[in-house]
Amino acid sequence: MRPYQVYVNQEALVSAPRSGPSRKAVMEFIHSLATDPHSIGDFVERDEVGRTVYVKIVGRFAITFWADHPVLEVKVTHIKPADK
């Protein structure tokens, strides 16, 4: 299987961790989506257009993403501090 391209919304990067172990863990998960685009999150939500999106908790951050399989892309739409 060909690796997918992973795109991160620039607004998501604003709230992403800037350094340290948290950033490393978040970035490793995002990179893993290229070779495992069928990855599912810890829970499922619907976005503003009704599309199913997955939310994965990585450390203290919630990463929202969805796979666009016809074009071999994964879109990361949000990276936010996870609720406690």
Model-predicted regions and their roles:
Residues S19-P37:
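A short, compositionally biased N-terminal segment around positions ~18-40 that is enriched
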